[in-house]
Every structure is written in structure tokens, then in C-alpha cells.
Amino acid sequence: MGNKKILAVLCCMALMAGCGNVSKESETSNIGNIKKEDIVSISQGSFEYADGFSGINDLSENSEAVIYGEVLSVKYIVGENGLCRTNLEVKVLQSLKGDFHTGDTVKVAKDQGITSIKDYIDSFADEEMKEVNREDFSEYSDDELEKLYIEQIGENDIMSEVGQKSILFLRKSAFYEEEQTYSRLNGPEGEYTEVSEDQFVNTQTLGGELKPPYTLDDYED
């Protein structure tokens, strides 16, 4: 099966603007069984943020919490009009700013996710939009729609995985009242992924970094 690549400019940032209804969401089941070849469409979002940050000190000053953590679990959710997000449980390995302590579990939400084509289509309330989206995947039968998937991810971001370690610059997400989740400051700009022991690279520059990696000592508040 060919893999469709779609560039999507998502004007409504779910985690920042809260443009979603939690009661109308569905969770992707059996995510551990999803194979790479089952993902037939990748939608890459281009997000615009009001402010940029000059570096880790600027990010830290504007964050409610900064943690070095490890992903314990991953949950994919699709909301209204096909907007996906990922809810993570992250174990705090070291607290660099804020009220969290080593061993705490933090809920982190990201603007990315994987959903079945069926759930994606069903998430649209407008019948005309359902028909348009069904036509986009007309080469697949109704049965196949339940077993094939769409991936959504922000530009210059990476998909989260269990065991992944990173430094996260956090603030309360738009879903905090319902789910007590935090989100990264400016998406991938607010995350530094551990590429080797105590070596961290900004997530949005992974693979093309021009600066040497940071260490935990560089993040002392």
C-alpha cells in the first residue's frame, strides 16, 4: 500500500486553544499492534506560535515546570473534526523547576497521534465532510478502514514512545481542568530529547543539529 503524505496547516491548536469537546472523543485501541505498514496517511501540521524563545533559559523562565522524565505510557485520542492528540504518562527522573518531585507521574499532552481511518471519518459531525473524507480513502473497503490508520504530527516533531527520555518545558494544557495534563511550551521547541546518556538535543532539530548537545547541568534553574 502506498503511503499518502498530506501537509495540513492546523490553525486551531487543540492543546493551546482548547478547540475540542472531551465528551466526543475516542481512544485508539491496541496501539501496540499497529504496524508501520498499517499507517497509510501521514498528516504533518504546521503550527504558528505567538512567541519564540531564545534558548533554554528563556524557555525555563516561561514554563510552569521543567522536568527530566521518561515516558511510561502512550494513549492516542481523536477529537472533533479529526484532530488527534497524545496523552502521555511521564515519570519524573529529576525536577528542574516547579513543584514536581523525583518519582512523580506527570500527564503530558501532545499535538500528535494515530487513529483508525474509521474513527477519523466518524469524528466529523458534518455529513458532507464525512463523505469528502470517505472519498479520500475510496480505495479501501469499510472493513479495511477499521484496520488502517492516519498519523498526525507537528512539523519538526517526533512521535513519543514508551521509554523515551527528554527534558520537558511545561505549562498547563487547554485540557488541564478535565484531565490535569500539561503541554510542551511551543510544541517541539519545548522538548530536548536524550540522544545518549546525559546528552540532550532540541527535538525540532534532531538529525540536523548545529550545536553540541546539552547536559542536565545546563538546565539548573
Q: Which residues make up each language-model segment?
A:
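Short aromatic-glycine-enriched beta-strand elements
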Residues: 77-91
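N-terminal, intrinsically disordered, polar/charged segments of Gram-positive cell-envelope systems
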Residues: 8, 21-62
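Conserved hydrophobic positions within beta-strands
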Residues: 69-71
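Extracytoplasmic
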Residues: 51, 62-66, 83-87, 101-105, ...
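Short, conserved beta-turn/loop elements at beta-strand boundaries and strand-helix junctions
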Residues: 73-79, 96-98
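Netrin-like (NTR/C345C) domain of secreted extracellular proteins
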Residues: 20-37, 112-221
